[in-house]
Amino acid sequence: MYQLEDDSLMLHNDLYQINMAESYWNDNIHEKMAVFDLYFRKMPFNSGYAVFNGLKRVIDFIEHFGFSESDLEYLKSIGYKDDFLSYLKDLKFTGSIRSMQEGELCFGNEPLLRVEAPLIQAQLIETILLNIVNFHTLITTKASRIRQIASNDKLMEFGTRRAQEIDAALWGARAAYIGGFDSTSNVRAGKLFGIPVSGTHAHAFVQTYGDEYVAFKKYAERHKNCVFLVDTFHTLKSGVPNAIKVAKELGDKINFVGIRLDSGDIAYLSKEARRMLDEAGFTETKIIASNDLDEEAITSLKAQGAKVDSWGVGTKLITGYDQPALGAVYKLVAIENEEGSYSDRIKLSNNAEKVTTPGKKNVYRIINKKTGKAEGDYITLENENPYDEQPLKLFHPVHTYKMKFIKSFEAIDLHHNIYENGKLVYQMPTEDESREYLAQGLQSIWDENKRFLNPQEYPVDLSKACWDNKHKRIFEVAEHVKEMEEDNE
């Protein structure tokens, strides 16, 4: 039964998606056009910003959208009827997708990606889109936070062995690179995505030879650029002295790039190792630290004066250790009506943050021309032009008394056309371009938004028309519920 050769991603799905698809098809509403927004509600890691990522893999999926023969055989085996399966056999994606680009700064309650497609298609891609964007955005955000703390220090992604399976390791390495890391230990990620690779050797290498001096010398015989792992036996009494000894003996035959500390009191050991290296004349040799690092650990080590030049970050990056789920959702906001236009849809909840914003919308970043900084993100209905309102009024969507007026601004549409009527129309940037785009984007928000602790909340506001439309729909649904309640009495 376990065969991947004919495996598509169409069944990488929640069962209820296929159940709903069958019901839509049976009721002959499956071709109705529908609009869904993908977004998250709360900022991950208590961060002041997040970083959108995952579009490359979304495109990979959509380009191969379609049920395989083995998919259909399996669906038949669990009870789906031949007439429905016959329809699925020829199903292709014919919808449109607008999305932020990879490396875009993003914030809670704004559409990262918008799908406009026949209802059955839009429903069948929900689970995998969420699966992709939730993970990629989470890890890229974590990586960017670590980059902010590390400043100009080198950052190496070491998470493959601790990742939640093979795909998470591969795509997590890519996410980390876009988020600001300099390299990865994952050789496959280097091959597929052009990410620089880096690595040293393991404790097992030293243990194999039973002696650090011998092990380091054997390593140097085949590797000119040497980074020696010095904590297998005793960092200061054995590891560092033997690394220095080998480097002195081999001289110009090797490039003594650095030593790596993977255990113990990194702050103390790095300071002592730095002193020993400097006294031996190796002032340019770098000290690399690893061992359960993240932005908090690096902040602490820097505060203690640790003499670390490069950081190898693994487990706590690749798993999103302190918040392993982004919590993005995919919500219906409009559906085709009998007249062929759209009727807005809203979901209500006793939790205010779970009330959706109905209608087809655009998201703009409002840049103050005087400061060059972002004043906030501005969500409008699709037919609105933010330049029509001068000055532009930004107000908090809940605490509406919080407002400001912007006279001189640029409104940047954050969504790009990715698919139009089933055709890919977007040229995917390279990983290096996405990485640089993020670096530039971070310059557009205030330092207060990037603070590690208690960052200033970045405004995400609705236009007056969008706000009015939302509250109109809330009132309509409330009236409908009231009528139903009266009918049931």
Write out the residue ranges for each language-model feature.
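Ordered alpha/beta subdomains of enzyme catalytic regions
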Residues: 1-222, 331-489
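Glycine-rich phosphate/ribose-binding loops and adjacent secondary-structure elements
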Residues: 204-375
